[in-house]
Amino acid sequence: MTADARPVICFVCTGNAARSVMARRMFAELATGYRATSAGTLVLEGHPMSSRTRSALRDHGLTDPDHRSRQFGTE
């Protein structure tokens, strides 16, 4: 397996269920030369994104069904 040598951009918000998730997914769609991640500062680990975020992404033709919230600093 080859390591991903692309620069990493991490989007951070409080819960990693809305803002950072949306920013990461939209950035990943537009900036393929980077690896995008997201995290939160006060997180309930392992929760899916908010239903409003899922709906907003869908409105832009984007999805992220595997997203689970994670605490900043765990990667």
What are these model-predicted stretches?
Residues 1-75:
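Short polar/charged helix/loop
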